[in-house]
Amino acid sequence: MILYSKRAQSAGSRANMLFFFLLAMVLTAIISGCAGKNFSILRPGIEVRGHYIDGVPFYQQKNSLCGPAAIASVLGFWGRTASLDQITAAVYLPELRGTLPMDMEHFMREAGFDTITSAGTLEELKVRIRTGLPVICLLDLGFGPYRQPHYVTVIGFDDANAVIIAHDGLKANSVIGYNTFENEWTRAGHWMLTANPRSSKDMQ
C-alpha cells in the first residue's frame, strides 16, 4: 500500500506539472496578441508605427547554439564575416549547453567592437533600435522553476501592434508580443548587448 501510494503521488505530481505546462502555453498564446501575425503583413508602414532595421542577416541555429547565431547576425550586419563554427568554438560551453553573456561581450570586443551591456527597459531597447543598432537580448523561455535561456537579435518593433521583431535563431523576423517579450526578458534580467565597430563615432 505504501508503494502504491508513492506511485500514485508521483503520477499525480507529473499530471500537475503537465497541467501547469499546458496552461502556461495557453496563457502565452493568449497574451502574445498580435504575435501570431506574419512579419510580411506588418512590414508595410512599420516606420510610422515603430522601426525596422534592414540588412541584418539571419542565421539558423544548430541545437542550443542561439548565442553564436545572434553574434553572427550582428557581425554580418556590420559587414564582418565569421562562420558559426568559429564563433561556437570561441564562446560555446558544452558543459552548460549554452553561452555566457560575458563571453558574448568578450567575443565582440575581441572582434573589434565597442560594446554596451545593460539591464535595459523596453523603451531603452526601442531607442537603440531607432538609432539603427541591432540588439542581442537574453530571454528565458522557461516557466516556473524551469529555465531555458535563449538569445535573440532584436531588429524592430511596432507600437501599434505591440510587437517586437527579432531573429530568434529558429525563424527570421519572428514577431513577439510586448507582453510575452517583457515576461521572458524579465526572467533573464533584462540583459541586452549592443555592439558597434570601434572605428564608428555613432555609439550612443
Regions found by a protein language model. Give the residues of each.
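Noncatalytic regulatory segments and standalone regulatory/sensor domains
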Residues: A35-S40, D158-Q204
